Amino acid sequence: MHISIVGITGYTGLELLRLALNHPHVTVSSIHATKEVGVQISDIFPHLKGIFDKEIQVFDSEFIMTHSDLVFFATPSGVAKDLSKNFVKNNFPVIDLSGDHRLSPDVYLKWYKKSPCTVDIQKRFTYGLSEVMNISHRNRFIANPGCYATATELALYPIISNHLIRVDSIIVDAKSGLTGAGKKLNQSSHYVNVNNNYVTYKLNKHQHIPEIVQTLQFFNKSLQNIQFSTSLIPVNRGIVATIYTRLENGVKINQIESTYKDVYKNKPFIRIKDGLPQLNEVIGTNYTDIGFVYNETTGVLTISSVIDNLIKGAAGQAIQNMNLMFNFDETDGLILAPLYI
């Protein structure tokens, strides 16, 4: 199949290209951006020289629909909702890696502070949490989940949907590598401010909060909200979500373990660890590693979920959704050993 990537010069666009080039069934037909149009991508990013040398093209939806079978949007928020309209009108498959189609329009406006897509268009998009939402060939439009949301939702879904924890007790402390802040320079991601430092940002205001709540409420209506903090740590890649919660009355810790293993037993990209996971065990992969510890003294269940924010938190999950949409094996192009060192 042939694909096009819009937003090729960002971290996510480049990672999407890297994964697509190694996919057994994919040819990258065109790449698009607002800058460097007409320039070979390998002249901007020399690591691609001799591997992929296509020119960056101006965005043209008609050209993409003529030459490709699917378009990926790896664009900043506020872009895809406008550029995708013609694709939706023509029922042409779209995977949007931005937040533009994840939330209802009123919630999007509140948290993103940008004009939303219409209700009709938003409802045509399926939220692409691959292991949970049963993505298939019936889905034409995918709203790929956010990175923090992916790590948090996959950690909580089994025990929230089975009503094993108190939903009024959830605290999430999430930490991300610097690529999670995007390429645009700002004070929170400036090298001098982040190196040898720990920076908390968007406390109680991160745009993935309503996404997480919306998704988890679908499986447990009792959930009203969560306490969620986000911080940057001085690594390039990765997310660690540490979650604190309490068990429902009568629930035993062995039920937690058996539920995780049962829910995810046929999910190739989720690994339930005997102990707590480490970030370097998932970097460079599409895996989500989940571990937990129960403190009998305090009655607190601590869950740790780790992912590579650029792969499972973005480009890898997008490829996984593509595989499911086009009836490929779910793991095609995604069997990647961790970088580890």
Swiss-Prot record:
InterPro entries assigned: AGPR_AS (IPR023013), AGPR_type-1 (IPR000706), NAD(P)-bd_dom_sf (IPR036291), NAGSA_dehydrogenase (IPR050085), Semialdehyde_DH_NAD-bd (IPR000534)
Keywords recorded for this protein, A-Z: Amino-acid biosynthesis, Arginine biosynthesis, Cytoplasm, NADP, Oxidoreductase
Signal sequence interval, chain numbering: none
Catalysed transformations (reactions): N-acetyl-L-glutamate 5-semialdehyde + phosphate + NADP(+) = N-acetyl-L-glutamyl 5-phosphate + NADPH + H(+)
Predominant cellular place of this UniProt entry's protein: cytoplasm
UniProt xrefs under Pfam families: Semialdhyde_dh, Semialdhyde_dhC_1
MF (Gene Ontology): N-acetyl-gamma-glutamyl-phosphate reductase activity; NAD binding; NADP+ binding
Pathway info: Amino-acid biosynthesis; L-arginine biosynthesis; N(2)-acetyl-L-ornithine from L-glutamate: step 3/4
Cellular location(s): Cytoplasm
GO BP annotation list: L-arginine biosynthetic process
Presence of the UniProt keyword Endoplasmic reticulum in the record: no
EC annotation from Swiss-Prot or TrEMBL: 1.2.1.38
Function of the protein: Catalyzes the NADPH-dependent reduction of N-acetyl-5-glutamyl phosphate to yield N-acetyl-L-glutamate 5-semialdehyde.
Family, as annotated: Belongs to the NAGSA dehydrogenase family. Type 1 subfamily.
Protein name: N-acetyl-gamma-glutamyl-phosphate reductase
